[in-house]
């Protein structure tokens, strides 16, 4: 068994990764008109933290793994919706409409980590058909 000192270091995130992901999450939430309280539930952070994120005074960080990963998933979902629907208004309507395949509105489902992943897989499956 290798000693801890002999193990390769984990890859480090780029110093600006937090600012980049935070801005991408802010932009995605803004374009999709996701309210701050819903964004807080999607990212698993407090409403105050979501408010600071939207104001640009808080940055997501790889050290805070859960919110980091959920932020990445939200941006992936936005990009997939953009590729599939091509217009923010259509994506907003899709997020807030009842969806028989998902059993509820995608936005409501996204408020849990499992639900966000489920919505992302659903959208990616439809993207794969194109």
Residue ranges: model-predicted function:
Residues 1-130:
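Non-transmembrane "mature" sequence context
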